[in-house]
Amino acid sequence: MKRIPFIHLMAVTMVWLIAFNVVPALGPRAAEVQTRAEAGQNADAEFQAMLARVDGAQLELQNGRPAAFKALWSRRDDITLSGGFGGTIEKGWEQINRRLDWVGTQFSKGTNTIERVVANASGDLGYVVQIEHLRFHVPGQAAESRRDYRVTMVFRRESEGWRIVHRQADSQMTKQPAQ
C-alpha cells in the first residue's frame, strides 16, 4: 500500500472542508480568490458580448459594409489576418484595413450561419473556433454564391475592451489526403 505523506493528506482534507463549506475559508487569500473568480465571470460576459458584436459585424461585412467589422480590430502592429479568399497573410492595421475594404467589395445580399465549436477567454486573451456558412451574391452577379469556412480568431483585451488580433479562415472542409 502506498503511503501518503501527512502534509499532503492535511492539505487535501482542508481543501475538501473548504470546498464543501464545512469550514469557511479564512484570511485575505480567500477574498482574493473570490475576487478573481468574479472578475473571470465578468470577463466571460464581456467576451461573449464581443462575440455577439463580431457576429453582427460579419453580417454587415457580408453585405458590403466593412466598417463595423473593422471597428472591432486592434490597431496595433502585431495583428494578423489570413483570409478565406487566400493570398498573403496581412500584418498590421494598415494592411488589414485595406484587405477588409477589399473584402467588403466582394459581398452583397449576404447571410450566414455560425457554428461555434469552442470559445474561451482567460485573462486578457480569448479565442473562438467556429464554422461559418456564408450565402451571398458577388456584386453585379445574379447567382447566389456559397462558402463554408473553418475559422479561428484570437482576441486581446485592450484599453478599449476586447479586440480581434488574429483571424484565420480557410475552406478546407473535407479531409485532404497527402499527395
PLM regions with names:
Residues 130-137:
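Generic short beta-strand segments
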Residues 139-146, 174-179:
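A short acidic/glycine-rich loop-to-helix N-cap element
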Residues 9-24:
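Bacterial N-terminal signal peptides
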Residues 1-7:
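N-terminal secretory signal peptides that target proteins for export/translocation
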Residues 20-75, 124, 176-179:
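Short, low-complexity N-terminal intrinsically disordered segments enriched in polar/charged residues
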Residues 44, 48-49, 66-122, 131, ...:
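A solvent-exposed, acidic/Ser-Thr-rich amphipathic alpha-helical stretch
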Residues 2, 23-34, 127, 148-175:
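Short beta-strand edge/turn micro-motifs at domain boundaries
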